[in-house]
Amino acid sequence: MKVNYTEVIRAIKGTTIPKPLSGTLSGHAAGEPFDKYVYKEIKKQFPNNTFRQYEYLNDLYNKNPTCIGAKAREALVNSPTILFLLSRGKNATGNWSIDNPFDEKQNDTADILVVENNFYEIIDIKTRNTSKSAQAPNIISAYKLAQSCAKMIDNGEFDNFTINYFEVDWKLEEDKLVCKDAHFACLFKSNPESLYINWAAAMQIQFHVCDLEQTFVENMDIWAKSYLKHFVTQAKKRADDMITKFVKPFEKYIT
């Protein structure tokens, strides 16, 4: 990783934002202002290489005006895995123009993207209300991650990107939200076999960043294969459970 997350934590601890005027103190409403603090601090470290995901794509296409259509624009990203993780899809890419640029989307893979020397540091920001015991947040689709691992293996892409998570822990004090602590973790340093897949929540991997162990010491090739083994095992178990619960009790009525 290129970003000095320890410096980012030092800078944002103690920062405050006004309590939202409406809505619950969770999710996007409370988290967005802290996300901007993190973005600002990372941009201080890499002023010319830090982007929002949509900003990076807009900048890339703006700099290559002769590339028209989805195929030509997708070819600007020389990594199938990175293209899969960052692309907005063929229709959106084909319809892009200077007058019709991309806007921020909540389901973008990266909240923040640091790109330097063809290395992509994908950063996702999570916020947590420390006053409440809440379910771990959605991190990334288990299926999307499986597809990414397959592309990594197919194309031998194990050293051109990483995926990091940054958690802001905050607490409500009077009329302000105060950042009490922050944590960071690298997805590819976690044990892939321990990642929890919530099949009922759109197949999302869920964890609190502060709880994600960082004990995996093998390379990304082994990580990708280990994760795919874990995903396939869990998917087969889920399929068996679905058949046992929702198919077998009713088969006798239709035979």
Predicted regions and their residues:
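Nucleic-acid endonuclease domains
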Residues: 1-109, 116, 121, 127-255
